[in-house]
Amino acid sequence: MLAPDFPRPRRLGVSYVAVALVTGSGGLIGSEAVRHFAGLGLDVVGIDNDMRQEFFGPEASTAWNVRRLADELGTAYTHQGIDLRDRDALAKIFAHYGRNIAVVIHTAAQPSHDWAVRDPFTDFDVNAVGTLNVLQNVREHCIDAPVIHCSTNKVYGDRPNSLPYTELATRWELAPDHPYYDGITEDMSIDQCLHSVFGASKVAADVMVQEYGRYFDMKTVVFRGGTLTGPAHSATELHGYLGYVMRCNMERRTYKIFGYQGKMVRDSIHSHDVLTAFEAFFRNPRSAAVYNLGGGRFSNSSHLEAFAIAEKISGHQMITEYVEQNRVGDHKWWIGSNAAFQADYPDWKQVYDVPMILREIYEANVDKWVPAQ
């Protein structure tokens, strides 16, 4: 529903303060976007109906994060608890702020492979149709506003699994002379491979964002993220890899490893580094841009390696259970290349690597994630 007061943008002299509209504003990247763009002096309108709680259960609720944003930012933040599938409610928000909207950051999504199989209609409606609803409203009400879309490396389906990996002691790895050793680039095909139902809905959204950029000459970017992480993640088994590793370690929960001997590799990028990339695009937008965005060679780990880091930080051994079957479409190895983005935005730099990320997650949750009695 709309906020009761549904305020006009604040005035700054004779002008209105520019507005950043953030979908999924209670989530990891969404909440970081709210803080970041408020810090740049924009008013922020956040859209989030806490559907994550429906996807993953009460422990995944983002309501606590929304309350914290309101407390921290006061009048600079307005929350709208609507569903992106509700076209009428979404249109009212866009019409209300109109051309005062300076940027749209679309992070809202259904992010789980497993959940998508159970309810493919909701998955597609949220990921694909919800994205279309956002794009069309930008076109109608604030066409000059850049659209920053959080896509995923899952748009490449299981194609990365066809690469010639070697099994090492703690990880799968490519040979140093392989073209993708420094990271998979955007030239990898997203066609004719197994994506999972979730991956397919994200492909539809990804391509539609590109199409609105090209067809309507809108400023759009697709960021195909690796593992996006940080201390604000409401981590669960189905989503939130590093956060869930640390949570299981701290709460003495059993962590289930799905296939690949626990040696599957993920690159991990901190939400801070994601948002500095968003800001770079906001300041110098392009039409129909597509970039991989992840930890790259700077920040990556296998599950076994992440376990070892978590154990060193907390002083507690991981409790694990191995499941032979990997998840459908899951990557054996993913390290993405940030080279294309860094070529276009050479001032952007990464700050956080995996040990720093896990340490921060531990310190942020040490009073909350306590062992089960």
Language-model-detected regions and their locations in the chain:
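C-terminal substrate-binding subdomain of Rossmann-fold SDR/epimerase-dehydratase oxidoreductases
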Residues: 33, 39, 227, 249-373
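Short, flexible micro-motifs
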Residues: 27-33, 133, 154, 160, ...
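N-terminal Rossmann-like NAD(P)+-binding domain of SDR-like oxidoreductases, especially those catalyzing
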Residues: 2, 6-228, 365
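Short, solvent-exposed loop/helix junctions and linker helices
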Residues: 23, 84, 125-128, 198-199, ...
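Short, solvent-exposed loop/turn segments at secondary-structure boundaries
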Residues: 56-58, 118-119, 232-237, 269, ...
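NAD(P)-dependent short-chain dehydrogenase/reductase
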Residues: 159-183, 197, 207-282, 307-313
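Activation loop
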Residues: 62-65, 112, 241, 245, ...
